[in-house]
A protein has these predicted regions:
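Charged, compositionally biased N-terminal leader segments and the immediate start
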Residues: 1-27
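Short, functionally important structural connectors and interaction interfaces within domains
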Residues: 6-7, 22, 40, 53, ...
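Thiamine diphosphate
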Residues: 189-192
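Short coil/turn segments at secondary-structure junctions
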Residues: 26, 33, 126-127
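Short, contiguous, helix-prone interaction/anchoring segments in small proteins
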Residues: 31-40
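Short, proline-centered helix/strand-breaking motifs
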Residues: 183-184
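Cofactor-binding active-site loop characterized by glycine-rich and histidine/acidic residues
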Residues: 47-50, 54, 58-180
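N-terminal glycine-rich anion-binding loops that anchor highly charged ligand groups
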Residues: 12-19, 40-53
Length: 192
């Protein structure tokens, strides 16, 4: 299992005060159109999030987990995936769903309790949202192991918040992935 880690206290800055890429910083080779598309997706999901929080606070919608501040991480990581890769979201990954082709209408239906909101179209390769903390981690690991055993060349990304790291499912899923060298990417968002 490969690990990429940086010191969480280390400041990460890509652009200088004038908006130019800082010297010595590696940035992905993206076209201007790709960057604009990603920015528009981040803005759209932020606006959706603001509206959904408003609906929830008005009592017009039940539980809703805001994602404010995570738009960039979600949109960028989803763009790094290939079409055949799989996503195992926690309950905040509305931006990932949008990039993968899941409509925001379907996301809203899910959080409003409508049964159509829980149906995931086959072409988006997203498993249903896992609300209990960390329960999607063993599922992602198991699916990636099955794919590996079948000789497939797919990646499986599993999103979770920092609270999941205190759960048994987190440790079991990562241990299994390490032992069997599964093609699983574990994406931990710091929700603090």
């Amino acid at each position: 299992m490969s690990t990429i880690q940086r010191d969480p206290r280390e400041r990460v800055q890509i652009l200088d005060e004038a908006g130019r890429v800082r010297e010595g910083v590696d940035v992905p080779d993206l076209t201007e159109d790709e960057l604009v598309e990603m920015y528009e997706q981040m803005r759209l999901v932020r606006r959706f999030d603001e509206r959904a929080v408003s609906l929830q606070r008005q009592g017009r919608m039940g539980t809703y987990p805001p994602l404010s501040g995570q738009e960039g991480a979600q949109v960028a990581s989803a763009h790094a995936l290939d079409a055949e890769d799989w996503v195992f979201p926690s309950y905040r990954e509305h931006g990932v769903g949008l990039v993968r082709g899941l409509s925001l209408e379907r996301t809203l239906l899910y959080w409003m309790g409508h049964e159509r909101g829980n149906y995931m179209p086959e072409d988006v390769n997203i498993f249903s949202v896992a609300v209990p903390i960390a329960t999607q981690i063993p599922h992602a690991t198991g699916a990636s192991w099955a794919s590996k055993l079948d000789g497939e060349e797919k990646a499986f990304i599993c999103y979770f918040g920092d609270g999941a790291t205190s759960e048994g499912d987190f440790h079991e899923g990562l241990n299994f992935a390490g032992v069997f060298d599964t093609p699983t990417v574990f994406f931990c968002n710091n929700n603090q």
